[in-house]
Every structure is written in C-alpha cells, then in structure tokens.
Amino acid sequence: MKENWYMFFKMLIKHEGGFTDDERDNGNAKGDGHGNKGSTMLGVTAWTWAEYTGKPAPIEVMKALTEEDVKPLYKKNYWDVVKADNLPSGVDISTADMCVNAGPSRAAKILQKSTGGLTVDGAIGKKTIAAIHDRDPKEVLNNYYYGRQKFYESLDDFEHYGKGWTRRNKETLELALSIV
C-alpha cells in the first residue's frame, strides 16, 4: 500500500545500518564495476549505486551517502519492482524487504509460494496480486516468514549472517502483522 512506503523505508534503514566493506558479504564481491573495491552504505552496494547513478562508486562516495540519497533508489528498484503499492498492508513491507535482501525474483517466488495455488514464476503480476487479496493476509505473512527463513537457512553463509537475518525476518513479520 502506498501509505506504507515511509514505514517500510524507516524499518529498512534500521536493518541495513551504516557503512561496511566486509569482503565476506556477497554484495561487496563485485566492487562497483569501475575498478573500485566493493562496499555497502545503508544497504546499497557500490555496484547498485554505480548502476543507479551511472557513475563510479568508490568508498569515499559510498561513505558519504545519506538516507535522502538512497530513498529514491529503494523506491524505484525495490518497492516499485515488487508492486508494493498494490499489495495488502503488511504483505507489502515483507515482500519489499525481502526484495532488498535477496532480489525481486526471490521475493516474488516466496510470496507466490506463501499464497498457494499460484504458478511460481518470480514475477508479481495481476494474477499474483489478485490471489493475495483473496487470502487472509496474516496467513500469507506467516507463510512468507517461514519461506524466507527456509531460504536464509539454505545459504552457505547462514552460519555467519544467520542471526541477523533471522532477527530481521522476525522484526519484519512483527511490523507487518501490526498493520494488517
């Protein structure tokens, strides 16, 4: 839902935190595509920022990013991509957060599995949106939580990042259920 965008962004920034250039983080592995070392600021990787702006994203650029800088990127590249304005309240936040964390296709597939009876194609279209609106949003959200957690636990780096991913998943579910 359109009115949940700001609530989502506030939660997202809390989860994504500040600057990191942790080489174990897959998001930092590619660098920025212009020969600069990979880094992440407010959850935005150097690669993503360079793609979004069309300019190199060296560490000094990444460290200078503000919430206001990254807000339009999150709206365009994540919230809008999963059509969050068209999703039920709560489902929008969970789906958009997973889109940031694991990409739009993964977020859509988990949503489609959570809804049941849908072709799992990784794209949120009219059929997916209609099916979600026909389901109990609390049931969809709980299914989404378990699908998301199963995905995290399947990752090789769950041992290192799993505690944070699990906390994020739980906090996202709690917020989402509170606005259904």
Report each predicted region and the residues it spans.
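Cell-wall polysaccharide-cleaving catalytic domain and substrate-binding groove, primarily
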Residues: 1-180
